[in-house]
């Protein structure tokens, strides 16, 4: 890892349909092998399915799902004299968002519905109602942090 200077953050353009930067980041995470148009059709298809099922604005359901999945605290390994401790630390906002997006997509890919569009819409709906594997993942991370609260004084 280079120690010179941190790479500058690239600007992410808002998506064409909703004008939302987070949707673009989500789309980029869904994308495989540079196939943006495929990722776009999956994400927009999932959001359209959500709108058809719930009769709500799909963007609010998406934002609620992401909010319910983003972790507030996580554990990081810290070596202190021969022993490795799992130290709970707060998660900064950019990492919270990245983890939330990643967990939502991983949970959606692990579902049993037929198409990725259906899987993604089902996982987003579950997450917006505080259910599903992505929310379970966040709960597990929070439990782990809670269990290791005794080591929080090793924070750096």
From Swiss-Prot:
Q: Name one GO biological process term.
A: translation
One of this protein's Pfam families, by short name?
Ribosomal_S7
InterPro entries registered for this protein in UniProt = Ribosomal_uS7 (IPR000235), Ribosomal_uS7_bac/org-type (IPR005717), Ribosomal_uS7_CS (IPR020606), Ribosomal_uS7_dom (IPR023798), Ribosomal_uS7_dom_sf (IPR036823)
Recorded hits in Gene3D superfamilies, A to Z, give:
Ribosomal protein S7 domain
The record, for SUPFAM superfamilies, names: Ribosomal protein S7
**Which GO molecular function annotation, any one, does this entry have?**
rRNA binding
Q: Which GO terms describe its cellular component?
A: small ribosomal subunit
Keywords for the protein's UniProt record, in alphabetical order: Ribonucleoprotein, Ribosomal protein, RNA-binding, rRNA-binding, tRNA-binding
Assembly behavior: Part of the 30S ribosomal subunit. Contacts proteins S9 and S11.
Family as reported in the entry's similarity comment:
Belongs to the universal ribosomal protein uS7 family.
Q: What does this protein do?
A: One of the primary rRNA binding proteins, it binds directly to 16S rRNA where it nucleates assembly of the head domain of the 30S subunit. Is located at the subunit interface close to the decoding center, probably blocks exit of the E-site tRNA.
Task: Tell me the NCBIfam families matching this sequence.
Answer: rpsG_bact (TIGR01029)
Which PANTHER family does the record match to this protein?
A: RIBOSOMAL PROTEIN S7
> In its UniProt entry, what is this protein called?
Small ribosomal subunit protein uS7
Organism source for this protein?
Answer: Rhodopseudomonas palustris (strain HaA2)
